[in-house]
Every structure is written in C-alpha cells, then in structure tokens.
C-alpha cells in the first residue's frame, strides 16, 4: 500500500461521512479505516482475503447470530447487495447510504439495525 497517497486522499474527505474503499483487480478488500460487510438476501459476506481483519470485525464474527461467508466481492456486483456496512474501532458500525460513483443505493437497514444492537452491548 502507498501510505502517503492514502493519507493524502483521507485529508481531502470527511472521514465521518465518507470512506475510501480499497480494491485489487475489481475485488473489494477493505476501507481505509474500516472493514466491510455486505448483505444480500439477509446473508452476510466479507472479502475472501487480502485485508486486515480488524478488532471490531473479529468481535462481531464471534457475537452476532449470523454466519458470515468469505467470498470475492466484485465491484461489478455491488448492485446485488442491499446493505454495505463499515465496521471499525473508530466508526463502530455504520450503514453506507450510497456510493454515487457506482450508482449503488442502500435498500434496507435490517441487518445494520441487528448488528448495531449487538455491537452496542459492548459500548
């Protein structure tokens, strides 16, 4: 990773409202300050590999009542997901409302509310 470039990009955005998503060969890896959870048909998915498995994601995988599957998450398939969640120590659990560049918009908050409820137990 090119840390100077990442830090430069982070300075240009409001990290409270935006996130930089990393990808390689059209496969999503993680956010610059978060891990990502994707929701499709009430099932949870995380990227298969090549990312840092953060503390918050580790906690959630052990405590939420849902199985999380590791798969390759392709940028071209974002339209399949009803929710995309950011999880991290600094942000907690956040539901992405839209990704304008991909014409993707959240269509549900169901899993977000459920996971946030579980996460709130440790706050």
Regions found by a protein language model. Name each.
Residues 1-123:
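Helix-start/capping segments and mature chain N-termini
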């Amino acid at each position: 990773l090119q840390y100077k470039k990442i830090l430069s990009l982070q300075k240009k955005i409001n990290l409270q409202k935006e996130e930089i998503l990393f990808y390689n060969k059209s496969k999503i890896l993680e956010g610059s300050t978060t891990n990502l959870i994707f929701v499709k048909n009430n099932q949870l998915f995380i990227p298969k590999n090549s990312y840092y498995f953060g503390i918050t994601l580790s906690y959630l995988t052990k405590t939420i009542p849902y199985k999380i599957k590791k798969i390759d998450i392709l940028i071209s398939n974002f339209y399949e997901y009803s929710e995309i969640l950011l999880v991290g120590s600094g942000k907690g659990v956040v539901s992405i409302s839209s990704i304008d560049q991909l014409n993707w918009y959240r269509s549900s908050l169901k899993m977000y509310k459920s996971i946030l409820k579980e996460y709130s137990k440790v706050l």
